[in-house]
Amino acid sequence: MRQKVTLACEQCGSRNYTTTKQMGRLGERLTANKFCSVCNKHTVHRETK
C-alpha cells in the first residue's frame, strides 16, 4: 500500500508537490530536486509530516 506525502521547499517552506511512497520506507524522508514557484528556481524539496 502507498502513502500520500507532501514535499516542501527547504528554503522558503512552501508546500508545492504531493506524491506517494511505499509504506515500508517510513524510516527515511523523501527528498527531490524540484522547481519552487515562490523562490523561482530549482531547490531541494523534503517530505513533510
From Swiss-Prot:
Statement: the UniProt record of this protein carries the keyword Amino-acid biosynthesis: no
Name of the protein this chain belongs to: Large ribosomal subunit protein bL33A
GO cellular component assignments: cytoplasm; ribonucleoprotein complex; ribosome
Annotated TM spans: none
Protein source organism: Geobacillus thermodenitrificans (strain NG80-2)
Stated family: Belongs to the bacterial ribosomal protein bL33 family.
GO biological process: translation
NCBIfam families associated with the record: PRK00504.1, PRK00595.1, rpmG_bact
GO MF terms held by the record: structural constituent of ribosome
Keyword line: Ribonucleoprotein, Ribosomal protein
